[in-house]
Regions:
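Radical SAM enzyme core and accessory elements
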Residues: 1-17, 55, 59-60, 396-402, ...
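N-terminal [4Fe-4S]-dependent radical SAM core
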Residues: 2-12, 21-30, 156-159, 165-216
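Structural motif
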Residues: 14, 84-85, 261
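Flexible glycine/acidic-rich beta-alpha junction loops that bind and position SAM and/or redox cofactors
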Residues: 24-29, 123-126, 222, 272, ...
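Glycine- and acidic-residue-enriched helix-capping/strand-helix junction motifs
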Residues: 29-45
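Glycine-rich beta-alpha loop elements in corrinoid/cobalamin-binding modules
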Residues: 46-181, 388-394
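Structural recognition of alpha->loop->beta junctions
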Residues: 126-144, 304, 309-315, 371-386
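Radical SAM [4Fe-4S] cluster-binding motif and immediate context
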Residues: 190-354, 361, 374
């Protein structure tokens, strides 16, 4: 980069922040050709936080979210040429895209310092080819210093939370330890105008421009053995005050947002705080429709009723299994009975209830798969996601399996199957069990009748439309997988037929 290019500007420099194309798999268990890919439906909140902080510090910031809009190489290259520095956000399922986009810039002859950051490289910091640095950890307290040092040629070894390539030697070096924001109330509310809000909607095109993500806490005090998220937050749990949260919600309401997704790992941990936020929403007359996630420990008729009054219509819970031994293996700290009670209480309060389930825990048998299936089908659940257990880098399960020599250093996401020595049941059986559970759950006439009646009672039809759309897309994906498999088998038989004729 030519330092003269920034001369005469009133800003401290121009920064481009990019979220590459990314999808998450619905009901896949990370097994190939299982489930379907779904696009991200929310703006990149992490980049918006950092972009806001950089903007307040005097930098000109542009954010491009290619997960929310169609990727255009020309737009990326043009924006990078306007910038003094380019940053990419790395999550588990866009790492290859990040590499491809960086290669795109290099091929176009764009010579700008490139940095990456995000949860994937926080868990396992690495330097990407053609990049100068990797930002590690929550960067609200460090990003301004890092960008300033890069643009002015400062000493990166003195920056916090950074892995960088020494310009003089080309060697990898680390800076000082990351800084974790202790007081979340001190972090400015993200400027959502940095992204085009019309790209995002959880409930289809009718609600575009009205959907926002809000984070009211970071981390989690629980220690589920399969979860790697606690490693991202250095095993801490921090919260924003109800007053701080309500101030953000008031600004969102004035701006016309009506659908909120509370992205906390567990919004319901602190009952007193949750009730204060709910009461504040009710008192201010906010007309939000809200999605939250929480553990079954918080199940309480009064709490659920108050949340419903505040506009919460969908509650997501991680039930994981209908087998107590599997819950203990996952270190959930709950019981099958408590899980069932939580679902019934939420249903009675008029909440739509979504639950996540995991198949393939170490000692699960055929009988256990059937027990989980019975448990799922007996509950008044409104939607489910099902996955096969994955040993993810950063989780306690991964560390234990790695210590036992069952997972190699480079295996960051290993599916629990008998082939990997991590479960009793083979991949093929777990794949069938996953598909069977989804089909039995979603394609019951009684399920759709109950969901329709619940929607009519609440006047909330968007959720049922979303589920219907996902079911159609799932069937389409499964039909496509089947046809591709048949085509491959057919092509494989063609040479043999020619040989037989010869």
């Amino acid at each position: 980069m030519d330092p003269v290019a920034s001369a005469g500007r009133t800003s401290r420099g121009r920064v481009l922040l990019v979220f590459p194309p990314a999808f998450f798999r619905l009901a896949s268990g990370h097994l190939p050709n299982t489930g379907m890919e779904m696009p991200y439906t929310f703006p990149p909140l992490g980049l918006l936080y950092l972009g806001t902080i950089l903007g307040r510090a005097g930098f000109e910031v542009e954010v491009i979210d290619f997960a929310g809009e169609t990727y255009q190489a020309e737009r990326l290259v043009a924006a990078a040429r306007r910038a003094d520095l380019v940053g990419f956000s790395v999550v588990r399922n866009n790492r290859d895209k990040v590499t491809a986009l960086i290669d795109e810039l290099v091929a176009a002859g764009v010579e700008r310092p490139i940095i990456v950051g995000g949860p994937d490289v926080t868990l396992r910091p690495v330097l990407f080819a053609h990049t100068l640095a990797t930002v590690v950890g929550e960067a609200e307290l460090t990003i301004v210093d890092i960008v300033e040092r890069i643009l002015t040629g400062g000493d990166l070894a003195q920056a916090h939370g950074i892995l960088f390539r020494d310009p003089a030697t080309g060697q990898e070096r680390t800076g000082r330890p990351p800084k974790l924001p202790a007081e979340l109330d001190d972090i400015p509310v993200p400027d959502r105008d940095l992204c085009d809000r019309d790209h995002y909607s959880l409930f289809g095109p009718r609600q575009r421009g009205k959907t926002a993500v809000v984070i009211t806490s970071r981390g989690c005090p629980f220690r589920c053995s399969f979860c790697s998220r606690i490693a991202l937050t250095q095993n801490t749990y921090r919260v924003r005050s109800p007053e701080n949260v309500l101030a953000e919600l008031e600004a969102l309401h004035r701006a016309g947002y009506r659908f909120l997704f509370f992205g906390d790992n567990n919004f319901l941990i602190d009952r007193k705080r949750v009730l204060a936020i709910a009461d504040g929403i009710i008192a201010r007359g906010f007309a939000f429709r809200i999605v939250v996630a929480g553990r079954v420990d918080a199940a309480d008729p009064e709490l659920f009723a108050r949340l419903r009054q505040a506009g919460v219509f969908l509650l997501s819970m991680g039930l994981e299994s209908g087998v107590q031994g599997s819950l203990d293996f996952l270190n959930k700290g709950t019981t099958v009975e408590r899980n069932g009670r939580a679902v019934r209480l939420a249903h009675q309060a008029g909440l739509f209830v979504h639950a996540n389930f995991i198949l393939g825990c170490a000692d699960e048998t055929e009988a256990d798969l059937l027990a989980t299936r019975r448990f799922v089908l007996e509950l008044p659940l409104d939607s489910i996601f099902v996955n096969v257990l994955s040993y993810q880098y950063g989780s306690a399960l991964w560390a234990e399996a790695h210590d036992r020599g069952l997972i190699a250093d480079g295996e960051l996401n290993t599916t629990a199957t008998s082939e990997h020595g991590l479960a009793r049941l083979p991949e093929a059986r777990l794949r069938r069990a996953l598909k069977d559970l989804l089909l039995r759950f979603f394609f019951r006439p009684s399920y759709w009748l109950r969901l329709a009646m619940k929607s009519a009672r609440s006047g909330e039809y968007d959720f049922m439309r979303l589920v219907a759309r996902l079911c159609v897309q799932y069937l389409y994906a499964e039909v496509g997988n089947t046809l591709r498999k048949k085509a491959t088998q057919w092509k494989a038989r063609i040479p043999r037929r020619h040989e037989e004729r010869a």
